[in-house]
Design a protein with these regions (language model features):
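Acyl-donor-binding surface of acyltransferase catalytic domains
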Residues: 2-134
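Conserved beta-strand-loop-alpha-helix junction that forms the acyl-donor binding cleft
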Residues: 212-223, 238-240
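A conserved beta-strand-loop-helix scaffold within acyl/acetyltransferase catalytic domains
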Residues: 145-152, 157-175, 180-183
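Conserved acetyl-CoA-binding loop of GNAT-fold acetyltransferases
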Residues: 226-236
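Conserved acetyl-CoA-binding loop-helix of GNAT-fold acetyltransferases
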Residues: 178, 188-202, 223-227
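Conserved GNAT acetyl-CoA-binding A-motif
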Residues: 59-61, 174, 203-215
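FIC/Doc superfamily catalytic core
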Residues: 92-96, 100-105, 141-142, 149-151, ...
Length: 240
C-alpha cells in the first residue's frame, strides 16, 4: 500500500458495517451465522447485533434463526435509537430487545478506528511461524498454536521474552480487528499501545483498515484507546 497516498476515511456508518462484517460470518441474506474467528472451529453468532454510530445511525443484524416477524419488530426499535455519544450509554430499547429475544446475556462496548498517524515509539517486532521460535513466550505460550491464523502479529520483547502482543483476531479483505494481550506483570508500562500502533501499521500496509473494539467495563483496554487517541465511531451491542 502506498503510504504517501491520502487515505479515504470511511463514514462512521461504513466503519460500523466493516466492524460487524469482521466480527461475524453472514449468509446471502446478511443474517449472522458464526463468530468470524480466524482459527479452526465455529462459535455461534449472537442472535442480535446493534451498532449505534456517533452520527445517530443504527445498524442491526440478526442471526439466521430469528423469525422474520420478530426481525421486523426489532428493526422498528433500532430505527428509534439515539446517537452513541456516550461510550457507556445503553441502547434506548435494551429491555425490549432482551424481552423480545428472551436474551440470556448481552455485551456492549465502544468501537474505534486506529488512525493512520498512530506509530510505535518503542521497538516492536513482527511475529510469524518463522520468527516466533526466536523468542520466549512464557505466559503467552498459546500464541504458538494460533500464530498462523492471526497475521499480522506484532510484539514487544524484553530480554528475549514477548511481554505484549497485538494480532488480527477478526479478518476480512477490508478490515482487521485487534486482539491485545499483555503479560500481567508488565501491564501499566505503555507496552500495549506500542504493539497496537505497530499492528495497525502492518494492517494498513496489507491494504486494510485497523479496527479496535472492547467492552465498556474493560477500563484497561479503553485506557489504551485513550492514550492512542483512537477515533471513536460508535458502540456495539449484542444479545445471546
Amino acid at each position: 500500500m502506498n503510504t504517501n497516498k491520502k487515505e479515504l476515511i470511511p463514514t462512521v456508518r461504513q466503519l460500523m458495517e466493516l466492524h460487524v462484517n469482521a466480527l461475524f460470518t453472514h449468509d446471502q441474506s446478511m443474517r449472522l451465522r458464526a463468530i468470524n474467528e480466524p482459527w479452526p472451529g465455529e462459535a455461534e453468532a449472537p442472535r442480535f447485533f446493534l451498532g449505534r454510530t456517533t452520527e445517530g445511525t443504527a445498524l442491526c443484524r440478526f442471526r439466521h434463526d430469528v423469525p422474520e416477524q420478530l426481525v421486523e419488530q426489532l428493526e422498528g426499535l433500532c430505527s428509534d435509537e439515539r446517537i452513541a455519544a456516550d461510550i457507556e450509554a445503553k441502547p434506548k430499547h435494551l429491555e425490549d430487545y432482551m424481552n423480545l429475544l428472551q436474551g440470556e446475556r448481552f455485551t456492549m462496548g465502544p468501537c474505534f478506528l486506529i488512525p493512520a498517524y498512530a506509530a510505535p515509539t518503542m521497538q516492536v517486532v513482527g511475529l510469524n511461524r518463522e520468527t516466533i521460535a526466536d523468542y520466549v513466550l512464557g505466559d503467552l505460550q498459546w500464541l504458538e498454536e494460533e500464530i498462523d491464523y492471526v497475521q499480522p502479529c506484532v510484539a514487544l520483547v524484553l530480554d528475549g521474552a514477548v511481554v505484549s502482543v497485538c494480532r488480527s483476531v477478526r479478518i476480512t479483505s477490508e478490515a482487521h480487528e485487534a486482539g491485545l494481550e499483555t503479560v500481567e506483570r508488565f501491564r501499566g508500562n505503555g507496552y500495549a499501545q506500542e504493539v497496537v500502533a505497530g499492528w495497525a501499521m502492518a494492517v494498513r500496509q496489507a491494504g486494510c483498515l485497523p479496527l479496535y473494539s472492547t467492552s465498556w467495563d474493560n477500563h484497561a483496554s479503553r485506557s489504551v484507546a485513550g492514550k492512542l487517541a483512537l477515533s471513536f465511531y460508535g458502540s456495539n451491542f449484542t444479545i445471546y
